[in-house]
């Protein structure tokens, strides 16, 4: 990494207000749906310096002491250095048993977590691995991209028919949720040109492109969703990331590739750059992400959309919900007046009695009317609803925490 290259996230810039806004959302949803029968369990993917975790836990400890006693915050961190830094920063909450640092790769997770939990991933998707494909202008078949490095260290792209099972599965999911005559990035004229003419142009026309523009696939995000589906059956997602980015390289869902030189950010036009000296950020198509997520969560083995578990079919009975809703809410009991009644795994307490809330609680109505929904919110919309905006308001009335990062969105399930 280039010396002095620092990236500031809203969590860092607006600490503690940004983390407190997320904490208010989490506590609100917890009180409406789980309190007091379950613990508040949270998994944060990639905790960075521990700023978000500290701000969330400080808020709960100071403002919601009853909730804090049953809070379990787990950070899944792949970096040993950051895991050590998080443990030092969160020492107060570690001593109280409210936080646990798990030094591991979430994409390699292999343990079942059957508790209702929130999975938090802020500024994670933009750094996850992507694959790139291009489509033949002859028959629209996809070709996967490979990078070759010669003896001098120069990079070159190679294209071959798609063989990677992860790419195949993502393309199958994408075509299911976004059926289209043309693949992403294909020129519009291919939709009305006869097939014989397409082949003739590809074979005989000088300078006619034989491949479409690159299409970057979020296969790393698909791997993350596989883990959630296989091992976190009662999770709720809290994702925030960039929906668009400036200065991207050519292609569909293409990233920004940039480095710092003499204190100035320099974007480049290719991802074929020297490793360790450039940062690569991918935008997230939140609408496609939501649809792929819901389709994957409601899939069956016969669909061929889900990843095959290593022990699938070996002394393990496979059960799948009939619809995505079953991943979030099996049943909704209404007998609140009888605490002895057995309560299902993920309850709906949106009609809970006032006794569940203290007199000082100001609890917004639930974001999701139906638990199988996945809601996309703008950065400003989420903060206007849950943030204590007076803490970041300037003298002229503007509020940078709300107005900045206009190219960011939230996905909440």
Locate each region found by the language model.
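Short catalytic/ligand-binding loop motif for oxyanion handling, primarily in non-cytosolic enzymes
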Residues: 51-53, 82, 127-129, 246-249
């Amino acid at each position: 990494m280039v010396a002095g290259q620092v990236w500031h996230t809203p969590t860092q810039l607006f600490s503690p207000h940004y983390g407190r806004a997320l904490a208010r959302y989490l506590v609100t949803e917890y009180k409406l749906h789980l309190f007091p029968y379950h613990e508040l369990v949270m998994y944060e993917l990639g905790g960075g310096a521990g700023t978000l975790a500290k701000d969330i836990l400080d808020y709960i400890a100071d403002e919601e002491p009853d909730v804090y006693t049953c809070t379990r915050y787990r950070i899944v961190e792949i970096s040993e250095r950051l895991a050590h830094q998080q443990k030092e920063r969160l020492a107060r909450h570690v001593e109280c048993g409210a936080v646990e640092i798990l030094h591991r790769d979430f994409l390699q997770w292999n343990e079942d977590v059957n508790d209702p939990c929130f999975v938090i991933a802020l500024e994670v998707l933009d750094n996850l691995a992507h694959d790139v494909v291009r489509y033949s202008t002859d028959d629209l078949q996809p070709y996967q991209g490979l990078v070759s490095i010669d003896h001098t260290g120069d990079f070159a792209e190679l294209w071959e028919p798609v063989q990677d099972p992860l790419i195949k599965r993502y393309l199958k999911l994408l075509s299911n949720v976004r059926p289209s005559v043309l693949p992403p990035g294909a020129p519009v004229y291919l939709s009305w040109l006869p097939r014989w003419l397409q082949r003739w142009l590809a074979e005989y026309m000088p300078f006619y492109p034989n491949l479409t523009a690159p299409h970057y696939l979020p296969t790393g995000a698909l791997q993350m969703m596989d883990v959630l589906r296989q091992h976190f059956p009662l999770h709720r997602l809290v994702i925030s990331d960039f929906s668009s980015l400036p200065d991207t390289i050519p292609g569909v869902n293409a990233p920004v590739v940039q480095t710092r030189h003499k204190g100035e950010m320099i974007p480049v036009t290719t991802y074929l750059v020297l490793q360790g000296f450039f940062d690569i950020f991918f935008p997230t198509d939140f609408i496609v992400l939501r649809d792929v997520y819901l389709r994957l969560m409601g899939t069956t083995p016969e669909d061929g959309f889900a990843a095959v578990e290593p022990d699938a079919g070996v002394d393990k009975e496979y059960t799948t919900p009939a619809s995505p809703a079953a991943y979030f809410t099996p049943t909704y009991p209404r007998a609140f007046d009888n605490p002895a009644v057995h309560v299902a795994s993920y309850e709906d307490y949106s009609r809970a009695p006032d006794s569940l809330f203290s007199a000082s609680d100001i609890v917004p109505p639930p974001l999701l009317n139906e638990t199988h929904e996945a809601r996309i919110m703008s950065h400003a919309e989420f903060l206007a609803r849950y943030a204590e905006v007076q803490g970041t308001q300037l003298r002229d009335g503007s509020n940078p925490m709300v107005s900045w990062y206009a190219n960011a969105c939230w996905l909440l399930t």
